[in-house]
Amino acid sequence: MAFQVNTNINAMNAHVQSALTQNALKTSLERLSSGLRINKAADDASGMTVADSLRSQASSLGQAIANTNDGMGIIQVADKAMDEQLKILDTVKVKATQAAQDGQTTESRKAIQSDIVRLIQGLDNIGNTTTYNGQALLSGQFTNKEFQVGAYSNQSIKASIGSTTSDKIGQVRIATGALITASGDISLTFKQVDGVNDVTLESVKVSSSAGTGIGVLAEVINKNSNRTGVKAYASVITTSDVAVQSGSLSNLTLNGIHLGNIADIKKNDSDGRLVAAINAVTSETGVEAYTDQKGRLNLRSIDGRGIEIKTDSVSNGPSALTMVNGGQDLTKGSTNYGRLSLTRLDAKSINVVSASDSQHLGFTAIGFGESQVAETTVNLRDVTGNFNANVKSASGANYNAVIASGNQSLGSGVTTLRGAMVVIDIAESAMKMLDKVRSDLGSVQNQMISTVNNISITQVNVKAAESQIRDVDFAEESANFNKNNILAQSGSYAMSQANTVQQNILRLLT
């Protein structure tokens, strides 16, 4: 080994190693003081990239959780508001049911109608004033809204809230045909009740015999309403064209039961002789009689069977009755199998065909002419005003005529019996619509809850993954620090010894 003075290789080596140790010691102190393994890109370039990506993902997930909670807050505000609206609709239905019985007077029905109008106004007020951050929720404007629920773009949940004001809910499709005057068997098929499938009902015989008639058909339709979505109402009423006149009836026959001659009938049947004679055989004919305020004779089927009535010409005086049902001559016989009203609790058309006529839809298939059907759609807002002639006709309130001209107005809301029945259906339809909206929102809220649960766990796992990369292992780094600290001390000693060794060369000069 050569002895050199100008270059102290040992000292240089000791210095280099001490410098490396100082750098390692500096890194250890930086990590221990910051708690991070990666304090700069040079510490772990690829690890820093992954850690920064994970940190960004975790931060975005935190905001996504906040977004989802905001969305659930919006849904809860709307849900509670609709809950109040449903309570209002339930009250409307109860009051309409209260009005749907003839123990009510016109004045009491008007009082009930006033209550209903106020309730609907309250419902509209809720629909128009329920807001979140200035956005109306129940007016129909809150549609196709998105809530970002992920760390990356287009990871969103969409939500829409339909309008719940009275002009947008409670749609009811009602249709009524003219008098059925032909007997026979009717087998109905409701087309595409769920958009795809048809429902065929059992065959019903329409006649004037017991256990048959349009009333039985209505019962068959109603017991299948859960499958078809359609309810039926049958009305079999024969009405004289004019008031009962003073006179007699000859050889009166009603639904095959011979009542014979009825003499000395007074005008408007003021002494009830004609009505009493007919009602005496109600158990056999299935028909009850009464006179209305105009003095006209009304025959009503109590079980929905048809009404067949015939008299002979009176030879020795005036006849008390000559025409019924808008021009049917009693001497030629009057046949009335009634009117059928169908109601669907939405705005969709009622598509029905019969086995005998599968080419026509609707009432034409049952035996009505093309122009012998009144149809219309009403909604909850219509309850607050007067029902127009179209509603009167389509609801069957005018009894024997398809069009309501010449009949008294149906009035407003529940101020008439038939109007109250219509309001019951409207309220039920409105409740179903609100329940559907609430159900959809409930599904969205459940989706949001599941999303929050998932991304909360994901956020924790992402932070854990970032921590594995970015955070320092204190046990490991403490060991490194202690090692480097000892090396630093030994390095200082080594440098001093290297200088001492170099001084030994001076002894050669002595």
Curated annotation (Swiss-Prot):
Q: Which domain of life is it from?
A: Bacteria
Cellular compartments annotated: Secreted; Bacterial flagellum
Membrane-spanning residues where? none
Instruction: Assign the protein's first listed, main location to one coarse class.
Output: secreted
Give the protein's biological function.
Answer: Flagellin is the subunit protein which polymerizes to form the filaments of bacterial flagella. Important for motility and virulence.
Which one GO biological process term can you cite for this protein?
Answer: bacterial-type flagellum-dependent swarming motility
The Gene Ontology terms for molecular function here are: structural molecule activity
List the protein's name.
Answer: Flagellin A
Q: Which InterPro entries match?
A: Flagellin, Flagellin_C, Flagellin_C_sub2, Flagellin_hook_IN_motif, Flagellin_N
Which UniProt keywords are given for this protein, alphabetically ordered? Answer: Bacterial flagellum, Secreted, Virulence
Q: Which protein family is it in?
A: Belongs to the bacterial flagellin family.
Gene Ontology CC terms, in alphabetical order: bacterial-type flagellum; extracellular region
Quaternary structure and interacting proteins, as annotated: Heteromer of FlaA and FlaB. FlaB is located proximal to the hook while the remainder of the filament is composed of the predominant FlaA.
